[in-house]
Amino acid sequence: MSGNFRFMMDQKDIVRFLTTTIDSFIQDRLINKEQRTQHKDQCAERLAAEDGNTDKETEVEYSDQAVLANLDWGIEALEEAINTYNMETKLARLDYAEKMLQVCAMLNPKQKTAGVPNSYLSAWAHLNLSYLWKLRNNIKSCIYHSLEMFIVDPFFSRIDFAPELWKNLFLPHMSSIVGWYSEERHKLMMEVLPESTDFSYTADFDKVFNESLVFSMRPNQLEKLQKLEQLYGESLDENTRLYAKYYNDCMNPDSTSSKKVVPMLPIAEPPMTPLHELSRSVPDFVKFGPILPKSSGFSMTTRRSNDGLNETTRENIASNSNHSKGEQSSLWAAKESIIEEIEDDLDSEHYDASVDSDKINIFSPEPKKNIKDEDVEPKVYRSNQKNQMNSPNISPMESPRRASNYSSTNPLRRKKESKFLRLLSNRFTGSIVSDHSLSSSPDTSSDHIFTGDEEVMVRNNIKRKNDSQTPSMNQDNENSLVLNDSSHCESEDGYQSSSSFPKLEKLTIGSKPPKDFVCPITGQIFSDPVTLETGQTYERKAIQEWLGTGNTTCPITRQALSANILPKTNYVLKRLIVSWKEQNPELAQEFSNSNTPRGSSCSPSAKDITMVSSIQRTTDSPSQKYKDDYIRQRNNRFTRVSVGASPTSVLSQAAVETIINSLTPYITSLCTSENLQDCEQAVLEIARLWKDSKTDPQIHSYLSKPTVVSGLVEILSASLNREVLRRSIYILSELIFSDERVGETLNSVDSDFDCLAMLLKNGLAEAALLIYQLRPVFAQLSEHELIPSLIQVIQNKSEDIDDFQLAIDPKAAAIAILEQILIGGDEYNRSVNASSVISANGIPAIVKYLDKTEGRRPVISILLCCMQAEKSCKSSIANRIELSPVLELFHAGNDSVRGICVEFLSELVRLNRRTSSNQTLQIIKDEGAFSTMHTFLVYLQMAPMEHQIAVASLLLQLDLLAEPRKMSIYREEAVETLIEALWQKDFSNNQMKALDALLFLIGHVTSSGKSYTEAGLLKIAGFDQPYNVLMKAEQLGHSDNDFMETMEDEKNAMKSWQKRVASVLCNHENGSIFQALEECLKSNSLKMAKSCLVLATWLTHMLFTLPDTGVRDVARKSLLEALMNVLQSSKNLEEKILASLALKSFISDPTVHEVLRVYAKSIYRILRKLKKYSTVAADILKALLNLNSVDVTELWSCKEVVELDLSSNGEVLSLHYLNGQVLSGHADGTIKVWDARKRIPRVIQETREHKKAVTSLCSSVDKLYSSSLDKTIRVWTIKPDGIKCIDVYDVKEAVYELAANAKLACYVTQGTGVKVFNWLDAPKFINFNKYVKCLAVSGDKLYCGCSGYSIQEVDLSKYTSTSFFTGTRKLLGKQTIHSLQIHDDLLFACGSSIDATAGKIFSLSSKMVVGSLSTGLDVHRVAINSDFIFAGTKFGTIEVWLKDKFTRVASIKMAGGNTKITSLASDADGMMLFVGSSDGKIQVWALD
């Protein structure tokens, strides 16, 4: 058939066509927000209509409500995703929308939910899912859901959801069906027309759809036409579904088959094959088939009754008559033409339900048949003018109507009312006026859609008018004018024909303001519109007068008003009015300053009302009664009369003129006088007169002239009289509230704002109100530095200004301006401005303002800004604030307000004292009329993503106030939200917020509001520096006198709180938080990874203080690998220490030993370097080296760094390491000081104060002691740049060995025994008949290594000696202990090798041998660090043993061959080894 040729393409072309078409359609919908909103409203209208058709007593199940709620939430979330520019928020809202929409998309289409067909809900969901996948750039899924929409419900997809898409995808395939329908309709029309009429199929084909012919049909013909339309619609739906499935198959070929099979193209077959090709003259609306009006709900069948069938069908078909022949409007334009349906303006009580039916039913060919109420459609459209003129019983200006003999407001009848399918032509509304009238106002085609009650009214009106005009069409002109006036005032649009109203011919549709801009009471354009709870909008002054007379109902709807205070001005409507006035200045002036009020264009004058009354007195016919009722109804809604006539009227014109005449001389004086006093007096008088008449538009217009405004501004800049300044601001403020153009006038001159800013700085509080009304931008406000002045306004008491009440309290205006300043600008500006508020002592006054109901939100916002910028002010706010207003604001506010409240409370509880935080939390928990925890829980489940973290954190803290012994839904939901946020890799901001919330939850908060959890953990690990720096800064920042007194309570409270937090977080869902932290540690964000590491370290540290519930295994499996990775790869010292602290917690677990073995080689060197900063690193290293499964020899590694040739100074007799420096003593008496902080030592000092060889070096605290063969002992001070000799002691004998401290010196001379010198008295000799080779001091004990392989212990307090150890004497050779070292309460004694043992290790406490060093070489020198024992031999080798296990690890061979090792020293960290030899060289080894 025609049109199918364009789809004769292969599968790739079809896919390309579908992609292009559907993608373009969805893209257009996403771009056009107004269209989406309009479409949602239309669908909601259908749902509402269906709700009105169902039995009200039927209770809707909760599950059904949930389904509808999911659909609504899904659409709202999708709309938020479309509107936001934040990619993280967009993705989150899309995920949420998908979950909600999938619920409806998967419904069974054959069932119903809450009376609504599931197919409709599912199709609607699929449409929104196609939007969703387009936003995700997944075109394939987008196409899938678009096609599923047509498969699930082709009918409503065609008429409601996507008519444009249906036209492009499916309509070209339906040409045969449309051709069949056209032929069948042609046959029916041929039966109606007279035989003489030329009405062939090929000539004037569009006349087939001229529905005026339907009025001539007989009942059986109407029934045939109805069945034809029903069959036509079913055919379109069936084939639409068929082609949608075909398209779906093309997009998704069978993947299971190895051979691709092209789907078979379906054929749209009509019930009968048409005889002709489809004529181009068939209107587009016919091709779309029957539609269902949205006001009809989902009723898809027609009530077939013998009484009402013909009239119902006639009305169903008659709606097409007003579609003109040449009209080629697009489908969407047609759809938009019926978006708005005007409400029924008339109460049913004004209608006569007993009107004679055979007088009303003037169109029925059988006048005896009545039209039942069930057959009355919600909309009836007029036939065109030509057909009306051909009817002998119809006036040229009237459209045919039919009435009901039952009241349309009867609830029983409404409940039984049937809805009918009608063609798309019903979307196009015609006019009841002539072609001339239509051409004069082409934009009003959508202004004449009636509700059912209005139709009945108009039909009755027309019938009665015809009855009164039956004798003659030439009745009295005046009476005819009145009747025409009343009969043509349709609904609220007040439409009229220019030929029918000669007296009001100027007030046509094109020359009057939109009805929504006109007050129904005053008849004038709104200047201060207020919208009541009933949805009706009135002028503020008018409705105030109405309520002031004792009325408590809405003037139009008669609904009771619950609020006693009028709402705020409807600024949205006001802005629209201002915009319209700018485009229509002359018309706006006419309707604003008209001498005669205009309620609408069809409102009768007083003369008309008089004439109607006279007619009513002479005629009692139903027609006249109806006219009287109708005119009264229109008068009540649209007209106003003089002041004395109605309590809803405003000032009479005479009173207005009197006030204007009174104002004129003062205005003249203000604008022209050069005398300041005269101008000031004029301002006072103008204010007095304006106060009583400010709502009258004419007076307002008179005072809004630019010259008057300029005069008032000049007074502000020139006058010094505060009363005059206040009155000037009062007048300008009221003018701006009524007309924003006055504010625009002031904003156009920068000096005007500067003047107001200066007045505010000079202490005029009212200036804040005017500045607020001018809506300045942040740059203007920041330029003038208004914060101190605004704080002053807030702090000062309100001054009494007599009875001149300002619209807004200056304090409220000041707070609003202050909020704008604080939230404006960049982060630096916000911080500086918030600090200015705090320094101006503004917080106490701002907190007090919370007592007022209005203005709480900006107060909370200001306080939140202050706390975020200056954390230290939290305590001040917490001590002053009452939290009840904050919670009340949370309960009553929207999502934005609730978000501010939650953020405020979350910041407020982050105090530096746990006890104070708990007290604040307890107040939050107990305050409020409702359960705070329950309210937070409900809000948590529906809060936007950006607020969920704060709510969850606050809710969890409230729950933790009590010991978490039982299951708590609050706790579970809060922790679940926080952990879920940690999993959201696509939303790094949300992850960071969750981590911050969890870290602050621990409770380590400084007085400045910073978390010091990391510093506290580093301190536990032995790295105190960050903690000490932080605490030092905090102490400088504040003084807390009673801190020490409450330290114990604070410590206990913190311990209890942290234990609760750790228990709740670790045990939630068997440690799921550790799995989430594992993912966070993989983040590319350094800040996030650091925060996650801190939290993981704290949790693992606390985990082993809690009872083991199996969570430890989960933590180990989740974090161990990640912690090892941090330890190996991180370049940050703090991170390595934190990872070490977390790893230490797992060391006791045997399963961790295997992991340590695997990583031993890679972490060994790291731990060795780290142990100088952290004690936990040393603990881990010790555990690693002591593992039986670890081969220490594989870990050992050393490298010679440098060899220093000092042979010119002779032998290197002693080496000593002290605070990053190495000191060497040489045979020529030289002492050299080396900087050993780098791998290659550097000489920083060389001194030769000893005359002979320096035999020994030792230190104590900051003193160095040296002994020499020159018979002296020298004492040196140690400085970073070298040493300085401060004392010299001549001991009269050569000193071979020295051990000294601040109290005494023990030294060895040439003879036996040892000498002890207390630096004051003569040396004491302790003789034990042995030659001493080495010394070691521990406390008040001196240990002497002697010949004969023995050790003597000397009590320095008593100067007595005892034998500590006596070795086995050998007959051959000398056995001597050459070196003693004390380390970690162990005494290491090394010397001659006896039985392959050259050293023994003793416990000083038990004096027992705890180990031995196995080697066949004699050991002359020993050096010990935390990990290893180094033993130097006389043959140039150094034996290395593991310190804790005494296991030989390696042997280091000196480069000089068999040179004797004379001295050894190791640095404190065990990373470097310094070796002195007899050939005068020092070798430096790096111990990796």
Curated annotation (Swiss-Prot):
InterPro entries: ARM-like, ARM-type_fold, ARM_LIN, ARM_LIN_2nd, E3_ubiquitin-ligase_LIN, LIN_N, RING-Ubox_PUB, Ubox_domain
Tissue-specificity statement: Expressed in roots and nodules.
UniProt keyword list: Nodulation, Repeat, Transferase, WD repeat
Annotated stretches, region: Disordered: 297-330, 351-414, 432-500
Low complexity bias spans: 432-444
This protein's pathway: Protein modification; protein ubiquitination
Pfam families: ARM_LIN, ARM_LIN_2nd, ARM_LIN_C, U-box, WD40
Gene ablation phenotype (knockout): Defective in intermediate steps of nodule differentiation leading to a strong reduction in the number of infections, mainly arrested in the root epidermis, thus producing nodule primordia that initiate normally but fail to mature (small white bumps).
Identification of the protein by name: Putative E3 ubiquitin-protein ligase LIN
Gene name of this polypeptide: LIN
